[in-house]
């Protein structure tokens, strides 16, 4: 078809944008880009119907950026997105597309981010504003967002905003925008409520319908794991140990993550390397050659760095960070299952990312099964199997005569008694394994396992709750059982009241940097120059090292373990306890981070755990009729085992 032969230069985009596209590896426009860009460049409204992953972000970003005035320090493009994750993704994409346009700034506004940070960004006069409806409406009410110079408005994933209950906020925002602007609306489906918006606010929009080109890959076994409790690095090591693979590629979202994951795998004995955009071509080619000839087994890469990668050895793909669109997911898992071989693909999904999983399933028209984290029994079995295979290989391929002679010398004890052969073999086996035991001890989960629910994904409202009135009486809510102090350890951090630190700062840093639900943070006491905090026992050494470097109000915590937490009755004064804190599993702290990991100004906000799971008293979720149904009764599969 003709549109596939079109280049971005043919569409009439300016040189700085074309240069950015070249840097990003874009070669030719996708169907939706080829159709939408000319209409938007000409100033027409566009109604786009396309699935997530079709390239619609570039379809609206490129032409609208092309038409802005970089000299005008005022919002000229406003993009509405249903979730903070999508808002951040769009803002990052538009920043990349405009990186060669001097003077162009992009800001993302969403619930959970501090207002002072957003206000400083708005005072700098950004030309592009991307945000969620609740926070954008709040800025409009406060008078901190001026849309008088707006020339372009985008509603991204409008059907998601409808399903999540934001459509009234969207209409309120659109009603406050001056006339004469250009509007682009994108939606995978077109329910009547969305049609009503198009009739009310859009001027003879050009309709663009694109069918998804994403197809299933029956030769690739796909599964996902709900990331909870254990840090993703530890979980990754367990999955790699449980799976038989020739070579693997692990996809992450950022350049820093490629290095961090590679270091974690190297510490656990895996021959791995990072592959990111900061590497020069020689280093990249060297890593690929090592992967091809077997000197390297695992690559950790970003999407951009892995473009064009084709290595037949790759039998496992791990999506360590879930991709933001379905097309990227298909491209990632397509790195395995090459040359007629079968492949496996594993996806890590955090609770707040379940919408992205649903998008992938909906686009690919399949249900991806969930797997359990490999347990100690399975890992022990794998280690024994691998060790037995190594022993068998030595028996079949090596000359063992000199070792038999050596064994005969140590076979007898100093007293002249014969040493039991099995005992001697067991001792040698233990020595051969070194510090890596063949028997894996069971690890207690960080928090109770919860089922992955296909409920309404309205987590973005967490940060906008203070705009929606009081929540009412909480007296009838069930109280949580307090965690046993015996499960906690006491840590000291070198920040205190004299540094301006508050309890909420500590809770936020621990929850965010340690990937720990704030309900698992115990008692906090503030002193003049330091503070103490109770955390669950069994913190991995790498997490403690990370906390040592983590900064609170620009001062490193320098965390160190003091010992087991003491019973409450033995503690007396001396410091400031966390405001409103109920310790482990209790209600959240005043002015602190909610259990969804967001910081709020003032009010309590909607109560969610850091993982995105609501506390008791949550409203029931709505069914998502368009997504494939899950059969929860079938249970989860064991990774690496039978389906």
From Swiss-Prot:
Q: Name one GO molecular function term.
A: ATP hydrolysis activity
Localization of this protein: Cytoplasm
Q: Which GO terms describe its cellular component?
A: cytosol; ribosome
User: Where is this chain compositionally biased, Basic and acidic residues type?
Assistant: 448-482, 567-643
Q: Where is this region: Disordered?
A: 440-482, 557-643
Helicase C-terminal domain: from which residue to which, for each copy?
232-379
Say yes or no: keyword Protease present: no
UniProt keywords (A-Z) are: ATP-binding, Cytoplasm, Helicase, Hydrolase, Nucleotide-binding, RNA-binding, Stress response
Where does motif DEAD box map? 156-159
Assign the protein's first listed, main location to one coarse class: cytoplasm
Residues binding ATP = 50-57
One GO process term, biological-process aspect: ribosomal large subunit assembly
Reactions catalysed according to its record:
ATP + H2O = ADP + phosphate + H(+)
UniProt motif Q motif: location: 6-34
Q: Which Pfam families match?
A: DbpA (PF03880), DEAD (PF00270), DeaD_C (PF12343), DeaD_dimer (PF25399), Helicase_C (PF00271)
Quote the EC number: 3.6.4.13
Entries under NCBIfam families matching the protein: PRK11634.1
| Homology family | Belongs to the DEAD box helicase family. DeaD/CsdA subfamily.
Q: Main role?
A: DEAD-box RNA helicase involved in various cellular processes at low temperature, including ribosome biogenesis, mRNA degradation and translation initiation.
| Name of the protein in question | ATP-dependent RNA helicase DeaD
Origin species:
Klebsiella pneumoniae
